UniProtKB/Swiss-Prot annotation:
Main subcellular location of this protein, as a coarse class: membrane
PROSITE patterns reported in the protein's UniProt record: NEUROTR_ION_CHANNEL (PS00236)
Official protein name in the record: Gamma-aminobutyric acid receptor subunit gamma-2
Transmembrane segments: 276-296, 303-322, 335-359, 452-472
Regulation of activity: Allosterically activated by benzodiazepines. Activated by pentobarbital. Potentiated by etomidate, propofol, pregnanolone. Inhibited by the antagonist bicuculline. Inhibited by zinc ions. Potentiated by histamine.
Subunit structure: Heteropentamer, formed by a combination of alpha (GABRA1-6), beta (GABRB1-3), gamma (GABRG1-3), delta (GABRD), epsilon (GABRE), rho (GABRR1-3), pi (GABRP) and theta (GABRQ) chains, each subunit exhibiting distinct physiological and pharmacological properties. Interacts with GABARAP. Interacts with KIF21B. Identified in a complex of 720 kDa composed of LHFPL4, NLGN2, GABRA1, GABRB2, GABRG2 and GABRB3. Interacts with LHFPL4. Interacts with SHISA7; interaction leads to the regulation of GABA(A) receptor trafficking, channel deactivation kinetics and pharmacology.
Topological category with respect to the lipid bilayer: Multi-pass membrane protein
């Protein structure tokens, strides 16, 4: 009896399928622990983009592909020729973002504006076939392709921003669409109409067009119906308030052709706070101050004269200061009218006292009184019949020594000018008070001129202010 073959039995055991599967698992497990056999891609083969905390992997475009595309596009490209030359006009879509406006210089009639200006057009010579949809380029490519010769027609001075690099951007799409944007600071002309100053409103334009291409070559269109503006709270308008804007398109005919002109109008309204404090209130107070002389005794010549001269000189100074913030226009502004009328009121108050002082100081004794003083009999038998004053005491107003002057009228009278007939012209003298020609006329008493002025001057000034403010603010 032969002994059992142990090795052959073991060999049959190890050759079973179960053993083979176990060995395969162990081998794969050992290989996975070795780092050299792990399959990983380099981080440089992908670019990561974060969007709402979701990571999207996109293949990175080799720089060599962009260089090849640009070289192919610029090969044989002539940047001196516009797209579709000789075929059809080039259509330029324009857009604008207003970063800030101000300040407005009324003396030079100009304003400063900071904008981002964008132009879009199609150039079939710049089409390319690639998986790249758009080429995002910097300002170095601007001079290598055709760019519209757009200029700002009412610009006095324009500066492009160059810090830290030129603020220009260029985009080229694979279908030939080109986007060109740049940042500009422009000092633009604005013809201010100052008839209603300082209650004026203005529409300051910003106009641009092609410099050399008429509308048969280039046509401009607005990309959007309205121009976008930034935060108006940071604008340095100072004396003005921003009301709104509007954009228009028009054709301007010149000797060199018809050009499409694009315009943006910025509506501005002037704030009156500064001028109310600096001009209107001081002028009004000076006019009121000139009326104080009507309550000062007419015999106080130095007081009334110095007050009148001081108010006149002050009004002259105020009118000069008010004009400094304006250009030297040939027409009368609303402020000029107000200051001039105030000056007339102040000057009239001074003239009123001069007139009063002249006639009061040049009174002559009446002829009847002279006869009475010379003839004792007439002085003896001349007496007045007793009279009773039936007027209420409240109706008797004694102002500025008027009652005292009435008592002295018996001793002093007024004579007409030499060589004049009192019955043939209107005069203010006492001797002219009687006569048929005086019937229905108003007799003015020199002694009561201050009383009349106390009523006339304030009433006239209030009526002027009513008409002035209603006309300029509501009409």
């Amino acid at each position: 009896m032969s002994s059992p073959n142990i090795w052959s039995t073991g060999s049959s055991v190890y050759s079973t399928p179960v053993f083979s599967q176990k060995m395969t698992v162990w081998i794969l497990l050992l290989l996975s622990l070795y780092p050299g056999f792990t399959s990983q891609k380099s981080d440089d083969d992908y670019e990561d983009y974060a969007s709402n905390k979701t990571w999207v992997l996109t293949p990175k475009v080799p720089e060599g592909d962009v260089t090849v595309i640009l070289n192919n596009l610029l090969e044989g490209y002539d940047n001196k020729l516009r797209p579709d030359i000789g075929v059809k006009p080039t259509l330029i879509h324009t857009d604008m973002y207003v970063n800030s406006i101000g300040p407005v210089n009324a003396i030079n009639m100009e304003y400063t504006i900071d904008i981002f200006f964008a132009q879009t057009w199609y150039d079939r010579r710049l089409k390319f076939n690639s998986t790249i949809k758009v080429l995002r380029l910097n300002s170095n490519m601007v001079g290598k392709i055709w760019i519209p010769d757009t200029f700002f027609r009412n610009s006095k001075k324009a500066d492009a921003h160059w810090i830290t690099t030129p603020n220009r951007m260029l985009r080229i799409w694979n279908d030939g669409r080109v986007l060109y944007t740049l940042r500009l600071t422009i000092d633009a002309e604005c013809q201010l109409q100052l008839h209603n100053f300082p209650m004026d409103e203005h529409s300051c334009p910003l106009e641009f067009s092609s410099y050399g291409y008429p509308r048969e070559e280039i046509v401009y269109q607005w990309k959007r119906s309205s121009v976008e503006v930034g935060d108006t709270r940071s604008w340095r308008l100072y004396q003005f308030s921003f009301v709104g804007l509007r954009n228009t398109t028009e054709v301007v005919k010149t000797t060199s052709g018809d050009y499409v002109v694009m315009s943006v109008y910025f509506d501005l309204s002037r704030r009156m706070g500064y001028f109310t404090i600096q001009t209107y209130i001081p002028c009004t107070l000076i006019v009121v101050l000139s009326w104080v002389s009507f309550w000062i005794n007419k015999d106080a010549v130095p007081a009334r004269t110095s007050l009148g001269i001081t108010t006149v000189l002050t009004m002259t100074t105020l009118s000069t200061i008010a004009r400094k913030s304006l250009p030297k226009v040939s027409y009368v502004t609303a402020m000029d009218l107000f200051v001039s009328v105030c000056f007339i009121f102040v000057f009239s108050a001074l003239v009123e006292y001069g007139t009063l002082h002249y006639f009061v100081s040049n009174r002559k004794p009446s002829k009847d009184k002279d006869k009475k003083k010379k003839n004792p009999l007439l002085r003896m038998f001349s007496f007045k019949a007793p009279t009773i004053d039936i007027r209420p005491r409240s109706a008797t107003i004694q102002m500025n020594n008027a009652t005292h002057l009435q008592e002295r009228d018996e001793e002093y009278g007024y004579e007409c000018l030499d060589g004049k007939d009192c019955a043939s012209f209107f005069c203010c003298f006492e001797d002219c008070r009687t006569g048929a020609w005086r019937h229905g006329r108003i007799h003015i008493r020199i002694a009561k001129m201050d009383s009349y002025a106390r009523i006339f001057f304030p009433t006239a000034f209030c009526l002027f202010n009513l008409v002035y403010w209603v006309s300029y603010l509501y009409l």
